[in-house]
């Protein structure tokens, strides 16, 4: 591009703010494009983007990208490929949810194996350790139940896949509202990171979220994964920053127009 951008990032929370059309998403996309799908970056200078990381000699980084626009699918994915009913998957958020369900099943197998291993060691604190291992999943379920309480939806805890109960009826995630899907995508993405160091990129996550959900978003993410580094763009920082005002950066502050 024509502008030189230098953005010094905080280890935990980074909020890039600016009006529409100022280049927030472009900056975020440039960084993401500098990383391969597996998080590798053989050089710290890629496609006009120089990345400085800690530790300095790192050659790959764990990351997730969440985009908030729930557009209809232009090219519906074939049902055979996904082994599910095409009628269920109508939007981009539905596709994200579908793949997150697979990751969620893997995550549960993983923590189940760790709990079994822990109990087999038969140490005096084995039960306590097992509880600690399963705590993030329970916290995730509690958080979703709390967020969805106004509409009477609760997660069915006996199911391996995510299903909801609402006044005696069972719902799939694809039957949720756009805002509910968006929040589920964000928190599920963070849960399956399994509390490991990750970079979480989010492009205007507030778009379809209730105002009170926007205000809680950053704290909820950090509660599920204290080791995550959040890098997000927003055009309404006053809403989303709730206690994080010092982590807000205006695009104009980091852009050299010369």
Language model: regions and residue ranges:
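Phosphate-coordinating catalytic segments in nucleotide- and nucleic-acid-processing enzymes
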Residues: 1, 6-8, 29-175
């Amino acid at each position: 591009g024509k502008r030189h951008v230098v953005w010094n990032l905080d280890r935990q929370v980074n909020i890039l703010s600016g009006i529409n059309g100022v280049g927030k998403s472009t900056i975020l996309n440039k960084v993401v494009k500098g990383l391969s799908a597996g998080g590798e970056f053989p050089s710290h200078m890629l496609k006009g983007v120089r990345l400085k990381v800690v530790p300095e000699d790192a050659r790959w980084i764990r990351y997730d990208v969440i985009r908030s626009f729930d557009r209809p699918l232009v090219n519906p994915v074939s049902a055979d490929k996904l082994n599910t009913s095409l009628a269920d998957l109508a939007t981009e958020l539905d596709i994200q949810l579908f793949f997150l369900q697979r990751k969620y099943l893997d995550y549960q197998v993983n923590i189940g194996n760790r709990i079994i291993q822990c109990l087999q060691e038969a140490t005096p604190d084995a039960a306590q350790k097992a509880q600690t291992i399963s705590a993030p999943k329970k916290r995730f379920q509690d958080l979703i139940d709390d967020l969805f309480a106004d509409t009477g939806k609760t997660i069915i805890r006996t199911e391996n896949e995510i299903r909801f109960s609402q006044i005696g009826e069972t719902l799939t995630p694809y039957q949720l509202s756009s805002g509910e899907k968006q929040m589920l995508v964000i928190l599920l993405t963070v849960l399956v990171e399994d509390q490991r160091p990750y970079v979480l990129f989010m492009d205007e996550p507030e778009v379809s979220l209730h105002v009170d959900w926007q205000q809680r978003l950053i704290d909820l993410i950090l509660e599920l994964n204290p080791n995550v580094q959040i890098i997000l763009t927003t055009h309404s920082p006053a809403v989303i920053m709730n206690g994080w005002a010092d982590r807000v950066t205006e695009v104009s502050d980091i852009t050299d127009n010369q």
